[in-house]
Amino acid sequence: MAFDKDAFLTVLDSMTVLELNDLVKAIEEKFGVSAASMAAPAAGGGGAGAAVAEEKTEFNVVLLEAGAQKVQVIKAVRELTGLGLKEAKDLVDGAPKNVKEGANKADAEAAKKKLEDAGAKVELK
C-alpha cells in the first residue's frame, strides 16, 4: 500500500480537536513516545503544530518607569547595556524604552531583577 501524504493531511485537516487529541495519545502508546518531548525541538525550530503552544525564547526588557531612585536605575542600565552615562540617562529619561532586546529568558529575568532592585518598573515582552 502506497502512502498518500496529501490524503493523510486532508484527513488530519478534517479532524476535530478531540479526535486529534485521541490520535496523539494513540501515537504515544503505539511508539512509546511523549508529545511533550517532541514539542521542545519543534518549538526551537520555529515550526510548532496547531495543538502545541510555542514557548517564547527571546524577550525584550522594557523599562517602564525609573521610580524614585533614578541614579541607581541609570547605574543598572549602564551595567546591563555598556552605555555611557549620557546615553543611559537619556534612555532612563525617555522611558518606556527597551533596555535589552532579543535576550534569552535567563538574561531577561536577571536584567529585570537588577532594574527592579534599583527601583525601576520593568516588564518583559
Swiss-Prot record:
Gene3D superfamilies: 3.30.1390.10, Single helix bin
GO biological process: translation
Name used for this protein in its record: Large ribosomal subunit protein bL12
Organism: Polaromonas naphthalenivorans (strain CJ2)
NCBIfam families: L12 (TIGR00855)
Entries under HAMAP family matching the protein: Ribosomal_bL12
Record's function text: Forms part of the ribosomal stalk which helps the ribosome interact with GTP-bound translation factors. Is thus essential for accurate translation.
Cited SUPFAM superfamilies: ClpS-like, Ribosomal protein L7/12, oligomerisation (N-terminal) domain
GO terms under cellular component: cytosolic large ribosomal subunit
Pfam families referenced in this protein's UniProt entry, alphabetically: Ribosomal_L12 (PF00542), Ribosomal_L12_N (PF16320)
Record's keyword terms, sorted: Ribonucleoprotein, Ribosomal protein
GO MF annotations in UniProt: mRNA binding; structural constituent of ribosome
Family recorded in the similarity comment: Belongs to the bacterial ribosomal protein bL12 family.
InterPro entries per UniProt: Ribosomal_bL12 (IPR000206), Ribosomal_bL12_C (IPR013823), Ribosomal_bL12_C/ClpS-like (IPR014719), Ribosomal_bL12_oligo (IPR008932), Ribosomal_bL12_oligo_N_sf (IPR036235)
Source organism, top-level taxon: Bacteria
